[in-house]
């Protein structure tokens, strides 16, 4: 029997990971977001945001500079596809996602992105004020920042990965 600690290494028990504030702040200084497309009332990062009840997948994003930290479960591919398609309509979409380079959605959609920033180490997700015992836990997976700029799609893979560390987010 695999103990609970090992289970987390192979599969997370949750699919919503609250964006670390310093990561959002650093990206927001660079992009000036106008819409958080995957949010809840308690963790929205922008004044304008979509909750699960709003169903961001069914909304238009094309007039916005979008921040997206989607649910990390099986539906993530639909969110990455939506980000790509909305960029073709004029949206700029910055995605914080798990770096699952072995998945179909990664090869089909992420590789069409304008930029992929692979985060060194593991991000510490969540609101640190709400963590048990005042500590946050590192994610059981590596993360990436994927950027879809408003442009015409190409038929070839165009993303060139760069590397950033969580410490770099704290410097800005």
Task: Show where each model-derived region lies.
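Class I S-adenosyl-L-methionine-dependent methyltransferase catalytic core
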Residues: 1-172
């Amino acid at each position: 029997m695999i103990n609970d600690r090992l289970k987390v290494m192979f599969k997370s028990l949750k699919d919503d990971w609250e964006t670390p504030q310093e990561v959002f702040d650093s990206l927001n200084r660079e992009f000036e977001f106008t819409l958080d497309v995957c949010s809840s009332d308690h963790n929205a990062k922008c004044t304008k945001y979509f909750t699960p009840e709003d169903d961001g997948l069914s909304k238009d994003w094309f007039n916005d500079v979008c921040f997206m930290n989607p649910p990390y479960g099986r539906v993530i591919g639909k969110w990455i596809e939506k980000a790509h398609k909305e960029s073709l309509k004029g949206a700029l979409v910055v995605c914080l996602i798990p770096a699952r380079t072995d998945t179909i959605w990664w090869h089909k959609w992420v590789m069409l992105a304008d930029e992929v920033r692979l985060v060194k180490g593991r991000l510490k997700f969540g609101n640190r004020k709400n963590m048990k015992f005042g500590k946050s836990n590192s994610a059981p997976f590596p993360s990436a920042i994927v950027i879809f700029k408003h442009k015409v799609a190409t038929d070839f893979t165009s993303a060139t990965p760069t590397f950033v560390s969580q410490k770099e987010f704290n410097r800005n």
